[in-house]
Amino acid sequence: MPSLKDLRNRITSVKATQKITKAMQMVAAAKLRRAQNAAENGRPYAERMAQVLGNLAGNLIGGVGAPRLLTGTGQDRVHLLVVCTGDRGLAGAFNSSIARLARDHANRLMADGKTVKIITIGKKGLDVLRRQFRDQIIASRDIRGNKPVDYPFAAEIADDILARFEAGEFDVATLFYSEFRSVISQIPTAQKLIPAELPTAEGAAATGAGSDAAMEFEPNEETILETLLPKNLTVQIFRALLENAASEQGARMSAMDSATRNAGEMIKKQTLIYNRTRQAMITKELIEIISGAEAL
């Protein structure tokens, strides 16, 4: 049985930990509001841009003259995985769930004889994936110095991916991130970046986002797509980073809330044990005193 001193030290240690987790919960809650607003404000622009490009692409007869960012290389041999996680832990399963999704995807590709290359955004993704894919990781970036996430940081990532694509380093690029739904719901997501997956005109009409208006484009569709597709790549990466930032703060807030409540339960349990142990010791001492008095 632990001594009273050991129990007091244990209770003091748990209380100190509880203060830390409570503070982290409050900080995450404050950051979550800003990150959530940024993610929600970025969605309409990214979705509408994809719809516009989808309408443009739908006007190309047989895909003739379409940019390579839309059609791809015509091959499916080399896949680039862009894995976005966070730099810090203590966020529940946020980082591990994204890394697991990317790892499973990479394993399936390699089992099919494909070549896999990986770019990691965030230290935690790098830490997890390099255990198995050290030779496949061709680049990595930290995001700690870029919070809150900004557009130029997304543009740097997009420019790097675009340069590697133009150099023929890969055929298909897929982005992995966590889509923010709510504080308690973040969905690990895989989105194909190259060749670009754009909504069709039929799909846009089904969701009410399309238009029946006849449109004329000046200059032609090919020229517009050639200009906008690289920008769309940056926009989609920026949106993913915003979703990731909100998901990370939501996951951390939830994890720290759970840790704070668990610490409270542990304090209650240890305090009860302490009181019972102290009461038993006092009772034992009283019995010894009474027994000694009776002996006299």
From Swiss-Prot:
This protein's GO CC annotations: plasma membrane; proton-transporting ATP synthase complex
GO biological process, one term: proton motive force-driven plasma membrane ATP synthesis
Keyword Ion transport (UniProt): yes
PROSITE patterns on file: ATPASE_GAMMA
Assigned keywords, A-Z: ATP synthesis, Cell inner membrane, Cell membrane, CF(1), Hydrogen ion transport, Ion transport, Membrane, Transport
Cell compartment(s), UniProt: Cell inner membrane
HAMAP family listed in its UniProt record: ATP_synth_gamma_bact (MF_00815)
Physiological role: Produces ATP from ADP in the presence of a proton gradient across the membrane. The gamma chain is believed to be important in regulating ATPase activity and the flow of protons through the CF(0) complex.
Protein name: ATP synthase gamma chain
Species whose genome carries this gene: Methylorubrum extorquens (strain PA1)
